[in-house]
């Protein structure tokens, strides 16, 4: 008798907007950031800002730090750790445009003068996020250049024949 093989697949991920549980204060903040971004022409992805707010809220509680304190180090760990780990735990698809949305969010906080004490300067935050996420000075992704091609490594020594 032949055995049957069962396959387990990971549970499907959901978009952040359909799955991210934001309390009323965070929902209100998401709306305020979205209105500000629209009015000022800054890029913002609603799934990304939902993840930013929810993951940062969780991180602030766990670490016992102010929600609005952003440093160049927290930006790095957020973009390459916290957000992805939070999305995985919540079974939420990692949103595109996370870097652009984070840049818009910290700029929003700076414009309202609500970055917490101990935060890096807004210029440092903007430069760090732009560098890490590959963004232009206006906060958009750098366009791919048509002459960008994969470069094959050149061997250091030729084999003897």
Question: Where are the language model's segments positioned?
Answer:
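N-terminal core-binding DNA-recognition domain of tyrosine recombinases/integrases
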Residues: 14-15, 31-137
């Amino acid at each position: 008798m032949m055995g049957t093989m069962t396959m387990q697949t990971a549970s499907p991920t959901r978009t952040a907007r359909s799955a991210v549980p934001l309390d009323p204060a965070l929902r209100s903040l998401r709306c305020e950031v979205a209105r500000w971004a629209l009015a000022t022409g800054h890029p913002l992805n609603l799934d990304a800002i939902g993840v930013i707010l929810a993951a940062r809220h969780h991180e602030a509680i766990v670490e016992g730090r102010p929600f609005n304190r952003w440093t160049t180090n927290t930006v790095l760990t957020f973009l390459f750790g916290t957000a992805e780990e939070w999305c995985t735990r919540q079974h939420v698809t990692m949103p595109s445009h996370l870097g652009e949305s984070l840049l818009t969010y910290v700029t929003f906080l700076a414009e309202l003068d609500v970055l917490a004490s101990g935060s890096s300067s807004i210029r440092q935050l903007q430069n760090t996020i732009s560098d890490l996420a590959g963004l232009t000075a206006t906060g958009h992704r750098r366009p791919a250049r048509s002459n960008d091609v994969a470069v094959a490594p050149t061997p250091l020594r030729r084999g003897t024949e």
